[in-house]
């Protein structure tokens, strides 16, 4: 299957990086190479781009899309490791970093990946298929209380307790092996009148995917390490697709902009914690009405940008 992914907020993200033609940039989530291609167009032969992705299918697709460009380095890894990746490449500082935290259209559309609740497939949801831990492990081995917390905290699912109980009850008969089986369990757990508000499995699938790929744990550290690797005036641009991610980015940016922990009554700062960034987007940038109509998957996207000081 061809790797397809429509880059969200493409123009806005590229503009936010304030690209210098001889700069060094990092695309932490290479995907199909959409954002990377626009960055490369603006770089001279002295500029450089590092493209990171934990999905080998994404890297293969990007290499084909970007075959005309020589100043890109491909890295099969998780952007959680951005610090060690740049260390290994002997790169100290960079001028801009982008993170697009969405699941690619390819990953959603390829049934075998197990991300989609619309297609029956083995329970998988691994971004990195070289990892052993998958959605199957979460669904079939987690205790009921663990499942409840994941569905509640990562999926913001109001019926998380009931869904967790139904999953545990069902798997005592036989292991739950496919997305179709899981969807049926969720349908039985959620009252019919609440199933009119979008697909009933959406929040549960989101929660399990986040748990499988440790997405929220990765994000905090990745933001801190990225800011540390930016040159002065370098930009960090992050696209999120649900409120949990957006909240983490918003809070972390605020912490880095105003890190002082002194009591408000202190006349001067004595904690020694200095601001590292300036937030550029006081409110997140969202897709235009036109983009939302063209690409329905962009509807929940939000772009937040900061500048290293």
From Swiss-Prot:
The lineage's top-level taxon is Bacteria
Query: Any idea of its EC number?
Result: 2.1.1.199
Q: Name one GO biological process term.
A: rRNA base methylation
| Catalysed reactions, semicolon-separated | cytidine(1402) in 16S rRNA + S-adenosyl-L-methionine = N(4)-methylcytidine(1402) in 16S rRNA + S-adenosyl-L-homocysteine + H(+)
Q: Where in the cell is it found?
A: Cytoplasm
The EC class name is transferase
Q: Where, by residue number, does the polypeptide cross the bilayer?
A: none
Task: Cite the GO molecular-function annotations of the record.
Answer: rRNA (cytosine-N4-)-methyltransferase activity
GO-annotated cellular components: cytoplasm
Q: Which residues bind S-adenosyl-L-methionine?
A: 33-35, 53, 79, 100, 107
PANTHER family, alphabetized: 12S RRNA N4-METHYLCYTIDINE METHYLTRANSFERASE, S-ADENOSYL-METHYLTRANSFERASE MRAW
Q: What does this protein's UniProt record list under function? A: Specifically methylates the N4 position of cytidine in position 1402 (C1402) of 16S rRNA.
Q: What is this protein called?
A: Ribosomal RNA small subunit methyltransferase H
Q: Which organism is it from?
A: Clostridium botulinum (strain Langeland / NCTC 10281 / Type F)
Q: What lineage does UniProt assign to this protein's organism?
A: Bacteria, Bacillati, Bacillota, Clostridia, Eubacteriales
């Amino acid at each position: 299957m061809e790797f397809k992914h429509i880059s969200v907020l493409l123009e806005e993200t590229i503009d936010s990086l304030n690209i210098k033609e001889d700069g060094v940039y990092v695309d932490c989530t290479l995907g199909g190479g959409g954002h990377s291609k626009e960055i490369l167009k603006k770089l001279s032969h002295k500029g450089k781009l590092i493209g990171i992705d934990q999905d080998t299918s994404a890297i293969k697709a990007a290499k084909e899309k970007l075959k005309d460009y020589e100043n890109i380095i491909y890295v099969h890894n998780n952007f959680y490791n951005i610090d060690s990746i740049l260390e290994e490449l002997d790169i100290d500082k960079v001028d801009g970093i982008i993170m697009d935290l969405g699941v690619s259209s390819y990953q959603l559309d390829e049934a075998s990946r197990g991300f989609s609740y619309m297609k029956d497939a083995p329970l998988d949801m691994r971004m990195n298929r070289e990892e052993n831990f998958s959605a199957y492990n979460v669904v079939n081995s987690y205790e009921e209380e663990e499942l409840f917390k994941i569905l509640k905290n990562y999926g913001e699912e109001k019926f998380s307790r009931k869904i967790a109980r139904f999953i545990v009850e069902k798997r005592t008969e036989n292991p739950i092996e496919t997305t179709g089986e899981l969807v049926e369990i969720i349908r039985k757990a959620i009252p019919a009148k609440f199933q009119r508000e979008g697909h009933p499995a959406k929040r549960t699938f989101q929660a399990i995917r986040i748990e499988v790929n440790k997405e929220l744990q990765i994000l905090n550290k990745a933001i801190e390490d990225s800011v540390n690797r930016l040159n002065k005036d370098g930009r960090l641009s992050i696209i999120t697709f649900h409120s949990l991610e957006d909240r983490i980015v918003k809070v972390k940016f605020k912490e880095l902009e105003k890190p002082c922990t002194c009591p408000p009554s202190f006349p001067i700062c004595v904690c020694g914690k200095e601001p590292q960034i300036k937030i550029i987007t006081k409110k997140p940038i969202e897709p235009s009405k036109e983009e939302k109509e063209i690409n329905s998957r962009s509807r929940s996207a939000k772009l937040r940008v900061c500048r290293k000081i």
